[in-house]
């Protein structure tokens, strides 16, 4: 039986370990993510953050330990099943289909809950039903349009994704992820490449997503954004957790300052 703390948390990580040859990308990671929280995961390059996301989404299988999401053991490695169960992800490098419209792109996310592969979801989002739109399709379209309004993309819904400016492409990727109706959203460096104005807008977007009832794990190098938005922060270094606490604690932790933040960090 799962422990009470595990059942009450959105996500519980227990002794999670991943090796590549003799290298420990993650070494016995322990971590709890509270439901409805913005929980940041920070650390230098090579600390294990991307490996952690790949384990959560089923891209990799752990060598030891377990992942418990909403009280259920995540022992199915298929990424499509993780999506159906309520886990979605964005990527540091934007991954869009450049020749699809903005609306079609978000529709792919909606269809990912019904189809076992992104390619089948792509076909369902792009191809028109032969005898008119089914009720389920109309509902998905309505949900996609609501998300476009939330992200301020309604006016560009018929443009190709490749025609959008960089900041709007970031918004579009977030909209597509939310279209899968996740309860846990993994954000991989969403502020990468953004200017200060776009980063401030991103701050508002992330808190808005949290206010929709979505728990968020944020991997990000912009420490001003991380410290200003996070409820809790876990710090990794060489695959090992070196600190876990509220932002004020993390800023003062000498291990974090030495390994990652540095003495002269300005927040």
Q: Where are the predicted features?
A:
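Glycine-rich phosphate-binding loops of nucleotide-dependent enzymes
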Residues: 2-267
């Amino acid at each position: 039986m799962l422990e009470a703390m595990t059942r009450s948390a959105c996500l519980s990580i227990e002794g999670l370990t991943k090796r590549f040859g003799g290298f420990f990308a993650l070494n016995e990671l322990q971590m709890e993510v509270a439901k409805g929280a913005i929980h940041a995961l920070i650390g230098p390059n090579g600390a294990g953050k991307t490996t952690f996301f790949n384990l959560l989404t089923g891209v990799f299988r752990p060598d030891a330990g377990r992942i418990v999401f909403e009280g259920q053991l995540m022992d199915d490695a298929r990424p499509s099943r993780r999506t159906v169960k309520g886990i979605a992800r964005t990527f540091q490098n934007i991954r869009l289909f450049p020749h699809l419209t903005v609306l079609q792109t978000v529709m792919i996310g909606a269809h990912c809950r019904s189809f076992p592969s992104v390619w089948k979801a792509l076909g369902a989002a792009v191809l028109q039903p032969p005898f008119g739109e089914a009720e389920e399709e109309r509902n998905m379209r309505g949900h996609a349009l609501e998300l476009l309004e939330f992200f301020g993309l309604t006016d560009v819904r018929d443009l190709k994704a490749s025609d959008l400016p960089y900041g709007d492409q970031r918004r579009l990727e977030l909209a597509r992820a939310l279209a899968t109706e996740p309860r846990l959203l993994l954000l991989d460096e969403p502020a990468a490449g953004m200017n200060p104005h776009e980063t401030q807008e991103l701050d508002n977007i992330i808190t808005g997503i949290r206010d929709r009832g979505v728990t968020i794990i944020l991997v990000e190098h912009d420490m001003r954004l991380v410290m200003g938005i996070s409820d809790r922060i876990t710090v990794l270094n060489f695959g090992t957790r070196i600190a876990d606490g509220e932002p004020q604690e993390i800023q003062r932790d000498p291990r974090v300052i030495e390994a990652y933040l540095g003495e002269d960090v300005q927040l």
